[in-house]
Amino acid sequence: MLTGALGAGVIALLLIFLTRGPPAPAAEAAASAPFAGGAAAGGGPPPDISNMSPRERFDRLYNRIMTAAENGDEGTVTNFSPMALQAYTMLDTVDADARYHAALIKLHTGDIDGATALGDTILANSPGHLFGYIVLGTVARFRKDDAGLKKAYSGFLSHYDAEMKAGRTEYTDHARSITDFKKAAEAERSPA
């Protein structure tokens, strides 16, 4: 019961944040943020996330966090990560893509064990899924675990062709991450 109340509280805070207007100096910057739904997203008021599905809420928060991380905005990453992870727990169904998103958020917030568990779960539920190897390889690189990184690279490369032929939508959505990890894996495999 406490978890439900906590979740409702997080969502309520998120609704308040999204529906109230930003301070005047930040209005222009906020309008161009991918989560804000301002002018850059087609104009008009911020989106009413109460009408969004749990997956849409989670994806919007994930996108905002990743954009902030790419721009070095640790404050946004820190502020929105708990909301995104709470939204993740509210998903009706959890697929490899959602687990991958949650794992990346956990990596950005220092929850390495949580990210590892999600990477393992991706591979347990979808053997050979490239996201599992990307998560586990990223964790291994962070931990300076050369054997773990080599294992992740090897698994990734051994499943790459078959997985790409599967035509998974999430692979198209994360093509850059897959390409970057593949290049790193091939560079590791090739003699210098």
Regions found by a protein language model. Give the residues of each.
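Long, contiguous interaction/recruitment modules in multidomain scaffold/adaptor proteins
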Residues: 1-60
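Alpha-helical solenoid repeat scaffolds
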Residues: 37, 62-63, 67-69, 102-106, ...
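Alpha-helical adaptor scaffolds
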Residues: 66-126, 135, 151, 158-161, ...
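Terminal, low-structured helical/coil segments at or just beyond the last alpha-helical repeat
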Residues: 151-192
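Structural signature of alpha-solenoid helical repeat junctions
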Residues: 56-57, 76, 94, 128, ...
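Compositionally biased, intrinsically disordered low-complexity segments
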Residues: 14, 19, 77-80, 181
